[in-house]
From Swiss-Prot:
This is Phosphoglucosamine mutase. The active site is at 102 (phosphoserine intermediate). The modification Phosphoserine is found at residue 102. It catalyses: alpha-D-glucosamine 1-phosphate = D-glucosamine 6-phosphate. Binds 1 Mg(2+) ion per subunit. GO terms for cellular component: cytosol. The gene is glmM. Its EC number is 5.4.2.10. GO terms for biological process: carbohydrate metabolic process; peptidoglycan biosynthetic process; UDP-N-acetylglucosamine biosynthetic process. Keywords: Isomerase, Magnesium, Metal-binding, Phosphoprotein. Catalyzes the conversion of glucosamine-6-phosphate to glucosamine-1-phosphate.
């Protein structure tokens, strides 16, 4: 990660860390690095945003920066992040930009770029933009007079994206009753339209954005109300998206959460059965549940683990030409259809499996036994030394012997804080908590910041 770019673009508190001034520079310098210096005099750039109140302010500044470098900007309005990624590629744009802080609270916002291929930027491209941001007054082109171009609104882009999504399934959803939670974000109008167009009977919550209520006690990070609504309305299942629509979490007919691991398993199992799963492989992160890997093994499906973060999942998928991957948190990437995590796409693919198999979501998800998980964070002096600490290794080995293959241990440094994360999965909740505490106590004793 650089000075400005994190694992998912540039983020910060809107108008404090992510200011209009910074948004202007990101538009100008990002537009130059990713579009203008390819030799295009007026490169086409698509700009979308979520429902945050700060979105319009940052959008105006960003577009001004892009136009100042000579870009022809098409404003998509409120749309999901994967919608921007798809349209950038489909419409032959040089660059796509999304203004969103995903599942973060309303005070935050972010700016992320997509190249002409629809993929997020490489580290090298981000470093090039950062180098310009740190210069006093970089000498870049400034078109004048007739060389300054208008920007245009292309709000029809959302409909084009939804039509594409609809074309990826071969069935309609007549007879399915589905509750949709739009997190008061980008999918608030997109999801009901898409599922309604596919003839599902839909109920909605979290689909009334007012600029301030995005992700507030709703969406994929807060599926409790969705679970209540599914049971109350006797629906077949529910789907919760996050603020920018790149994540999804499901709820079965009994109000039980079905997470990203289970969704990947259900879709992967169907793809494998139909010989559509490239190299019989699903890419996940080290945080996926042990039950996920055991269920895949029983189906004859291979798995490949990456570091935590959907960008690492996508990198591995591209490297190995794999077409399904994702995270427990609900970022699911289906590379046959889009270049990034796509909640709406995943949702209709999941609904398609439910419709075609005639099985309930609880029945499909129940094929994967989730192991109870316990996570303890320990504040430490040097998080990176945990992997070489002899005492920590010793207690981990001891616990592994005691678990006898019915569990998993993951001890890793946090990517953003001075913490070591101790995660243990075991046969019972009690075992998971006991083993995690056992390891965390040693980490605290030998490396703890607060000891």
């Amino acid at each position: 990660m650089g000075k400005y770019f994190g694992t998912d673009g540039v983020r910060g508190v809107a108008n404090q860390e992510l200011t209009p001034e910074l948004a202007f520079k990101l538009g100008r310098y990002g537009g130059y690095v990713l579009a203008h210096n390819k030799g295009e005099k007026h490169p086409r750039v698509l700009v979308g945003r979520d429902t945050r109140v700060s979105g319009e302010m940052l959008e105006s500044a960003l577009i001004a920066g892009l136009i100042s470098i000579g870009a022809e900007v098409m404003r998509l309005g409120i749309i999901s992040t994967p919608g921007v990624a798809y349209l950038t590629r489909d419409m032959g744009a040089e660059l796509g930009v999304m203004i969103s802080a995903s599942h973060n609270p309303v005070a935050d916002n972010g700016i992320k770029f997509f190249g002409s291929d629809g993929f997020k930027l490489s580290d090298e491209q981000e470093n090039e933009i950062e180098a310009l941001l740190d210069q006093e007054n970089p000498e870049l082109p400034r078109p004048v007079g007739n060389d300054i171009v208008h920007y245009s609104d292309y709000f029809e882009g959302a409909q084009k994206y939804l039509s594409y999504l609809k074309s990826t399934v071969d069935v309609n959803f007549e007879g399915l009753k589905i509750v949709l939670d739009g997190a008061n974000g980008s999918t608030s109008s997109l999801a009901p339209f898409l599922f309604g167009d596919l003839e599902a009977d839909t109920e909605t919550i979290g689909c009334s954005p007012d600029g301030y209520n995005i992700n507030e006690k709703c969406g994929s990070t807060h599926p409790e109300k969705l679970a209540e609504k599914v049971v109350e309305t006797e629906s077949d299942f529910g789907l919760a998206f996050d603020g920018d629509g790149d994540r999804i979490i499901a709820v079965d007919e009994n109000g039980q959460i079905v997470d990203g691991d289970q969704i990947m398993f259900i879709i992967g199992q169907e793809m494998h059965k139909n010989q559509e799963l490239n190299n019989d492989m699903i890419v996940s992160t080290v945080m996926s549940n042990l039950g996920f890997y055991k269920a895949l093994e029983q189906e004859g499906i291979k798995s490949n683990k990456t570091k935590v973060g959907d960008r690492y999942v996508v990198e591995e998928m591209r490297r190995g030409n794999y077409n399904l991957g994702g995270e427990q948190s609900g970022h699911i990437v289906m590379m046959d259809y889009n270049t990034t995590g796509d909640g709406l796409l995943t949702g209709i693919q999941l609904a398609s499996v439910i419709k075609m198999t005639g099985k309930s979501l609880s029945e499909l998800a129940g094929q994967m036994k989730k192991y109870p998980q316990s996570l303890i964070n320990v504040r430490v002096t040097d998080k990176y030394r945990v992997e070489e600490n002899v005492d920590v290794k010793e207690v981990m080995t001891k616990v592994e012997v005691e678990m006898n293959g019915e569990g998993r241990i993951l001890v890793r440094p946090s990517g953003t804080e001075p913490l070591v994360r101790v995660m243990v999965e075991a046969a019972t909740d009690e075992d998971a908590e006991r083993f995690a505490q056992q390891i965390a106590d040693v980490v605290q004793d030998k490396m703890g910041l607060d000891k």
